[in-house]
Amino acid sequence: MSLLQITYIYRDPRDAMLSAYEYGRRALEKGRPNAFSHLSDFEKSLAFMEDYVRIWEKWQVEKNVLIVRYEDLLQDYEAESARLVGFLELDGSKPEVREVIDGYRPGQAEGQQGLHFYKGKIGRFREVYSAEQQSVLADHFGTDLEKMGYEI
């Protein structure tokens, strides 16, 4: 095993955009601004996500990186966590490894101090953003969404 094992987990930019915006708003309401607190509206959040997508593009050409879709982790946690354990060359039967895997299992991590996990619902942007906003997102990220494996 090399000393550095890189795992890159990405999420549908539309859901990531909504999540970042809401996370920033909650932090401001609590009087503790964070890295997302400047996302005060749809346009600022959209500009922020453009950088997110460009970063995703750069990771696609890197070698020896495990790239995982967030949604795949939620929908098939067993397979994706096994893939991660294999990539990291860990013994998945060891209690300390199982403890970490089980601690991050969807539904288990909610509300844990220090974890950036609030709702984690797939496709929630469709419920929150207007049809016009969804159209802007489709126009803006359409090609990238397809490359990332998402439906427009």
Per-region residue spans from a language model:
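Generic structural "secondary-structure junction" signal
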Residues: S19, V61, Q75, K119, ...
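Positively charged interface segments
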Residues: Q112, K147, I152
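Non-catalytic cap/lid and distal C-terminal segments of serine-dependent acyl enzymes
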Residues: R14, A20, L88, V136-G149
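PAPS-dependent sulfotransferase catalytic core
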Residues: R98-G142
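PAPS-dependent sulfotransferase catalytic domain
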Residues: M1-D102, P106-H116
